[in-house]
Structures are given as C-alpha cells and as structure tokens.
C-alpha cells in the first residue's frame, strides 16, 4: 500500500506511525504491530498506532523517530513481523536462561529501537522477576559495551568511581575526583543526571560549569587536568543502558544483574581500568542488608574479571543522607565546603575512604602515586586547587564561592515537636521531598538537614529546611512534608505518635 507522509509533532523514543483505521484494516495490522516503510531506497520499521481522526485515510503520520522523512513523501507500507528477540524475551519471562546470542539480539534490537515500549518493559520485568544469572550478566555487560561509543587512554591505570545510588546527598564523586587527580592519577569521570533522585552528579556539577562535551573535548580536559566531571549521556557510552533505565523508571525496578551490566558496560566504554564501586546498604537504600551488599559486590568483581576490569567494592552505610544538602545547589555547597576543609563530616570521611581505595588499587598495579594519603591531599588544599582547575577548563568560574551558590529563596522550616534523639532520617522521603520542591530541574530547590540520626533535639529545634524557587513548588513540598515523618525524634512518649 502506498501512503503519503504527514509528520506528527510527537516526541517518541522509537519510530512510531499513525494509521487511519481504514488503512490499518486493509493492511491487517493493529496497534503495536509493525509496518515496513520504503522510500527512495531507504527502509525503516515503525510501530503502529491506529486512529480514527488524527490522520486521514491514504496518509501515514510519522513521529520524530523518522527524522529523514519529509512531508508529502509517498512511501510503500507493508506489514512487518516481530524482531526475533521478542521470542527470547518470552523465554526469559518463562524463567529460562538466555545465551550470549539471545542477549546480543535483545541488546541490538533495543539499540536500534526495534522493540516497542511494551516489549522493552516485558524484558525489564522478566529480568526483575526471574533474575539474571552470573553468566547472563557477564554476556549482557559485554554486549551492552560493544554498542557504545568508546573512549581510550594511554595510561595503564585509569581510575573511576561509581555509586549504585539510593542515598540522599551522596555527592562524594566531585571530592574523590579532585583528590585522585591531585595525586597524579587519571580519572575521567562520566556521570548521570538524576532519574528518580533530587540530583545526579552531573546536575550538581552543572551548578559549577558545563558538563556536556564531545569525546574529543573530554580527552582534552583530561589531558590538561588529569580528570573531568561530565555527563555521560552526551557521548553515548552505553545507549542501550539509557533506554533500559527509562523503561525501569515507572516501576522503580533495579534488577541486580542489570545494575551490574549498566555500571560496568559504561565503565568499559569509558576506558576505565580500576574502579571502586560504592554499594550503600541499609533501610531506605537500594540494598537493604550487609549480606545482600556482599553478594552484589562479589558479582561485580566476577563480572569485572570477565571484562578485564579491576573492581573493588566499598560497602557503606546508607540509612542516612550523607551531606547536609539535598538538591543540586545545596549539594554543590557541601562539595565546596568539604574541599575547603569544612562541610559535613560523613561526606568528608566517605570521600577520603573511597579515594584511598583507588590509591591502593593503583599502587598494587605498580603506578607511581603521591605518597600522601587522601586526607593529606585534601587538607593541603591540593584537591580544592585541582577541582577549581577542572571547573575552569570545563568553562566554569574557578573562583566560585559558597556565597555565590544560593538556594531557592522560598523556604519552610520544620521543627521538633518533642525533646529527644533523632532516631531516623528517611532517605526516600527526604529525596521525594526535595523533588516536590522542584529538584533537580530547579537547581536551587531541595532540603537542608539540620539534625542527623543520633543528634539531640529539643522541642522547637529546626530539623530541616525546605528550599524552593516558586511558591507553588514550596506549597507542594509543604503538603508532602505534613504527611510524612522526614526526620523522626524519639522521646519518652515515642510509642504514642498522635491522637486523632
């Protein structure tokens, strides 16, 4: 059947076509079926959506996923079958183990946008419900890395650090990168933006400087400073992972095997050789127990060995937020404070421990490393100087101060109702509160924690402050805070929460 193209102004992750009901019936296709579209020697496959009114009979609506088709182009449209990888997804749903070829086909079809949203979601759910074996995780990681753009380095040791996330205010990466680069090691850090959190490392660094660079620009930055703090999404290190993450987001699914494949495929594409993986565990974190964290760490190391990567895992307590601030500007202030010798002690200590692990790994590999400890490098001001160098080369102001980094001016303070000890700071709730306030899109939005677990509190003491950039966002955050105990103070009458 020949149809005339009509561009449709809808953004889609993959090529989608709109067919009038009459044309769909003639072709024998339904919504979520596929059609092959041929024009001028080009062939594309689109996923069908059927409509009564949005396009007329004889025309075919083309989404933004078809950038090369112009208005009025006449195309030949024929029904197309499902990709072969759909059968492999069915096998995984049945609890079968997939081989390297099957996983490779799934990765290739995700990368080429040949799977519908429903099929990709089925793959994610199958991986979550039935798990990925160690062998599947190894093969999946390898295949995901193969389709990404590659960075390569001349140095025998290229350091990296990654956290699996789940802890509010865990902004150790800029501090670690500054310390490690100041010690003379190479650490090209590509980071993510927030998916479900109030700030990713890239969002926080964007407060200081641009973070989107080409691979050539990243190489120049690292050559000049020894490190970088950039957004990995701009260089397509693991495009399949980015698409899988978007499919996981609505149900907050994070299968352990997929987590490992996500992290290590990006690290291999980035050219990293020695990687410390931060695995926070505890109430409210992604990993809830120490035994679960140990199992995940063992699998990280086994998959790393398969890929030729040296992996060390740091199992860290993740029940409480790490910094005082949650949200891009507030976390940036904490980073600068730690680099200046002040700031939240948990953020300082964790950064030092992770940097020292990297130093140990480099020394074991025979690399000449600064004899000083991470604490000595931080306390000497060398890490602050290196951080300012990186900010400058990435196009930011090297003289930026904490006073320059002002959070949103719409504020609300929440105080203790009783005397006692802070017995819990809810990681998930405080992250959700910061998002309600506008983070990460509003860089100045977020939450400042004034009392941590174990601190004494007297009735009337400020427990936390909400910052927003608009009154509407502040009101949304205020309503959320009123319905949850973000920071819990336990007194003698703790058993009775309230009377209603």
Curated annotation (Swiss-Prot):
Protein keywords: Glycosyltransferase, Transferase
InterPro entries: AMP_phosphorylase, Glycosyl_Trfase_fam3, Glycosyl_Trfase_fam3_N_dom, Glycosyl_Trfase_fam3_N_dom_sf, Nuc_phospho_transferase, PYNP-like_C_sf, PYNP_C, Pyrmidine_PPase_CS
The protein's Enzyme Commission number: 2.4.2.57
GO MF terms held by the record: 1,4-alpha-oligoglucan phosphorylase activity; AMP binding; pentosyltransferase activity
SS bonds (residue pairs): none
Enzyme class, broadest EC rank: transferase
Gene Ontology CC: one annotated term: cytosol
Annotated GO biological process: AMP catabolic process; pyrimidine deoxyribonucleoside metabolic process; pyrimidine nucleobase metabolic process
Pfam families: Glycos_trans_3N (PF02885), Glycos_transf_3 (PF00591), PYNP_C (PF07831)
SUPFAM superfamilies: Nucleoside phosphorylase/phosphoribosyltransferase catalytic domain, Nucleoside phosphorylase/phosphoribosyltransferase N-terminal domain, Pyrimidine nucleoside phosphorylase C-terminal domain
Catalytic activity: AMP + phosphate = alpha-D-ribose 1,5-bisphosphate + adenine; CMP + phosphate = cytosine + alpha-D-ribose 1,5-bisphosphate; UMP + phosphate = alpha-D-ribose 1,5-bisphosphate + uracil
Source species, domain of life: Archaea
Active-site residues, as the UniProt record annotates them: 254
Residues annotated to bind AMP: 166, 192-197, 201, 262, 286
PANTHER family: THYMIDINE PHOSPHORYLASE
Function: Catalyzes the conversion of AMP and phosphate to adenine and ribose 1,5-bisphosphate (R15P). Exhibits phosphorylase activity toward CMP and UMP in addition to AMP. Functions in an archaeal AMP degradation pathway, together with R15P isomerase and RubisCO.
Similarity comment text for this entry: Belongs to the thymidine/pyrimidine-nucleoside phosphorylase family. Type 2 subfamily.
HAMAP family per record: AMP_phosphorylase
Protein name: AMP phosphorylase
Organism: Natronomonas pharaonis (strain ATCC 35678 / DSM 2160 / CIP 103997 / JCM 8858 / NBRC 14720 / NCIMB 2260 / Gabara) (Halobacterium pharaonis)
Gene of this entry: deoA
């Amino acid at each position: 059947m020949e149809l005339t193209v009509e561009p449709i102004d809808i953004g889609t992750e993959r090529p989608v076509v709109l067919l009038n009901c009459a044309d769909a019936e003639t072709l024998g296709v339904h919504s979520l079926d596929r059609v092959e579209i041929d024009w001028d020697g080009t062939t594309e496959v689109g996923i069908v959506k059927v409509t009564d009114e949005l396009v007329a009979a004889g025309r075919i609506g083309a989404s933004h996923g078809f950038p090369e088709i112009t208005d009025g182009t006449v195309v030949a449209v024929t029904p197309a079958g499902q990709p072969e990888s759909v059968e492999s997804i069915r096998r995984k749903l049945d609890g079968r183990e997939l081989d390297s070829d099957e996983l490779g086909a799934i990765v290739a079809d995700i990368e080429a946008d040949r799977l519908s949203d429903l099929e990709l979601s089925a793959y994610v759910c199958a991986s979550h419900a039935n798990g990925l074996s160690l062998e599947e995780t190894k093969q999946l990681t390898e295949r995901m890395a193969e389709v990404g753009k590659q960075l390569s380095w001349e140095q025998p040791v290229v350091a990296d650090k990654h956290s699996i996330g789940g802890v509010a205010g865990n902004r150790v990466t800029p501090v670690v990168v500054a310390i490690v680069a100041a010690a003379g090691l190479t650490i090209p850090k590509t980071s993510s933006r927030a998916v479900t959190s109030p700030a990713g490392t890239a969002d926080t660094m964007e407060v200081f400087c641009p973070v989107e660079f080409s691979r050539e620009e990243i190489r120049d930055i690292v050559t000049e400073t020894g490190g970088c703090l950039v957004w990995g999404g701009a260089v397509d290190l693991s495009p399949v992972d980015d698409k899988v993450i978007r499919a996981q987001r609505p149900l907050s699914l994070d299968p352990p095997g997929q987590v490992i494949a996500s992290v290590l495929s990006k690290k291999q594409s980035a050219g990293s050789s020695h990687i410390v993986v931060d695995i926070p565990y505890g109430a409210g974190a992604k990993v809830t127990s120490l035994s679960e964290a140990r199992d995940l760490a063992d699998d990280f190391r086994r998959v790393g060995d398969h890929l030729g990567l040296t992996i060390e895992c740091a199992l860290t307590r993740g029940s409480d937020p790490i910094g005082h601030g949650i949200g891009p500007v507030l976390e940036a202030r904490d980073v600068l404070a730690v680099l200046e010798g002040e700031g939240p002690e948990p953020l300082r200590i964790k950064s030092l421990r992770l940097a020292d692990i990297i130093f140990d790994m480099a020394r074991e590999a025979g690399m000449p490393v600064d004899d000083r400890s991470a604490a000595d490098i931080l306390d000497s001001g060398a890490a602050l100087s290196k951080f300012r160098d990186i900010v400058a080369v990435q196009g930011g102001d090297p003289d930026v101060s904490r006073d320059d980094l002002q959070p949103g001016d719409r504020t609300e303070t929440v105080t203790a109702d009783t005397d006692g000890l802070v017995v819990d700071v809810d990681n998930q709730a405080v992250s959700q509160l910061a998002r309600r306030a506008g983070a990460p899109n509003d860089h100045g939005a977020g939450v400042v924690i004034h009392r941590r677990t174990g601190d004494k509190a007297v009735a009337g003491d400020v427990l936390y402050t909400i910052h927003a950039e608009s009154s509407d966002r502040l009101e949304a955050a205020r309503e959320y805070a009123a319905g949850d105990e973000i920071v819990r103070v336990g007194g003698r009458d703790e058993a009775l929460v309230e009377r209603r």
